[in-house]
């Protein structure tokens, strides 16, 4: 991804679901205008999720996701289907390609998508080789209670209808979230304290920093940045105290102890807790840390899949803070990327990263799973602020 690209996590996620050989790959190629997905007459050609980023006029940046057929068979087929079901968790809008035999699989998928409150656009593909498209569409409408769009991905017929349907199904709140919310307005002075993150390549900033700076510039704020060691010197160089200080959560305590009394304090992780998830639930759940004992079990979830580093916040620093508070025998499990247990009942607490690499839908899906099992869930920044005794002083 270049510096001018929209991160995939900020794009509208549009997933294509259907049986094997229903034309999902052909449709995604027609929609994107590129040979993004491999097309074959052999059922089951798509064996993993295939994604393609593009812009749709009137909608903006999108990410199309091609999924394996939900009627796959055998042990390997079950694995492919599980990946298809995982894709639902990150889907903002679903394109459901209907077959021409029974509709049991389609109805099951439709029910699952509706249960997750995901807008669905049913599609009847291959009308260029069907003689009964209209009657089949009527039958599908009777079975699924929603009329499909008639298209031919091969001939690119009806593609514009799909784009229009996506626009009409666009969630009203999509893209309306703000990283900094109402914390700052035009002309406010904002100081960003950014330790040199060894996970970021030389000469680069990590994604939350880039996105936050861009939003502050869009709000016409006055933006100043510094590293932790230059924080005191930066304050002295400023004509007035910052309205807001945004820091890396790892140095929360250091910055809190040195900040001007009138400056408000938050962190990138805390801001992303609200931007991607449910900040109020995270703050409420942080109190569960007090109830932990050495026999408790905690799950730490990291969106990134980078190789562990010596001072990794999720694998080293946060566990150290927790065990220092609770005891060395506290059991802590770590998952990364798309790995996330279905059964969370063994855990007394889930702590998630800021999820800059996940879209909001995916994070909210995880929160929903956790809440359904009555497990408290918080966030790196919120947890660190709580462990440092300053959560009530942090703004979000």
Residue ranges of each PLM-predicted region?
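Conserved G1/Walker A P-loop phosphate-binding module
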Residues: 1-78, 82, 86-89
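Short, flexible loop segments at the rims of nucleotide/cofactor-binding pockets, characterized by
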Residues: 41, 70-76, 98-101, 169-171, ...
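G-domain G4 guanine-recognition motif of GTPases
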Residues: 67, 97-101, 118-134, 149-158, ...
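Conserved C-terminal guanine-recognition region of P-loop GTPase G domains, centered on the G4
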Residues: 52-60, 75-148, 178-182, 205-221, ...
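Conserved hydrophobic helix-helix packing surfaces used for dimerization/oligomerization
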Residues: 14, 190, 296-298
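Canonical P-loop GTPase G-domain recognition
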Residues: 115-121, 126-182, 189-191, 220-229, ...
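C-terminal effector/interaction modules appended to NTPase cores
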Residues: 1-2, 19-25, 203-396
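Long, well-ordered amphipathic alpha-helical subdomains in the mid-to-C-terminal portions
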Residues: 183-209
């Amino acid at each position: 991804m270049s510096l001018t690209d929209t991160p995939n996590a900020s794009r509208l996620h549009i997933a294509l679901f259907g049986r094997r050989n229903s034309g999902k790959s052909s449709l995604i190629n027609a929609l994107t205008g590129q040979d993004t997905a491999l097309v074959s007459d052999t059922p089951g050609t798509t064996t993993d999720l295939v994604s393609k980023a593009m812009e749709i006029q009137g909608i903006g940046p999108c990410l199309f996701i091609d999924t394996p057929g939900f009627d796959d068979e055998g042990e390997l087929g079950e694995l492919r289907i599980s990946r298809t079901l995982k894709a639902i968790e990150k889907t903002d809008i679903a394109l459901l390609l209907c077959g021409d035999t029974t509709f049991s699989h389609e109805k099951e998928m439709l029910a699952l998508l509706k249960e997750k409150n995901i807008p669905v656009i049913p599609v009847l593909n291959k009308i260029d080789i069907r003689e009964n498209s209209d009657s089949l569409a009527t039958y599908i409408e009777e079975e699924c209670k929603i009329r499909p769009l008639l298209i031919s991905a091969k001939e690119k017929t009806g593609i514009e209808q799909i784009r229009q349907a996506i626009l009409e199904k666009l969630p009203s709140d999509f893209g309306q979230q703000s990283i900094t919310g109402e914390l700052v307005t035009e002309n406010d002075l904002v100081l960003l304290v950014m330790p040199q993150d060894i996970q970021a390549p030389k000469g680069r900033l990590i994604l939350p920093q880039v996105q936050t700076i861009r939003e502050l510039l869009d709000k016409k704020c006055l933006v100043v940045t510094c590293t932790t060691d230059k924080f005191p010197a930066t304050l002295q160089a400023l004509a007035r105290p910052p309205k807001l200080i945004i820091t890396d959560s790892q140095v929360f305590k250091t910055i809190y102890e040195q900040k001007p009394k009138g400056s408000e304090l938050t962190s990138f992780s805390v801001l992303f807790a609200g931007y991607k998830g449910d900040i109020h639930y995270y703050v409420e759940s942080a109190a569960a840390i007090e109830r932990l004992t050495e026999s408790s079990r905690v799950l730490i979830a990291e969106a990134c899949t980078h190789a562990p580093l010596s001072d990794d916040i999720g694998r080293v620093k946060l566990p150290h803070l927790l065990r220092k508070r609770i005891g060395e025998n506290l059991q802590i499990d770590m998952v990364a990327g798309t790995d996330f247990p279905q059964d969370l009942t063994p855990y007394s607490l889930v702590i998630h990263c800021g999820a800059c690499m996940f879209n909001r839908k995916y994070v909210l899906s995880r929160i929903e799973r956790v809440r359904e099992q009555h497990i408290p869930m918080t966030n790196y920044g919120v947890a660190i602020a709580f462990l440092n005794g300053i959560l009530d002083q942090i703004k979000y």
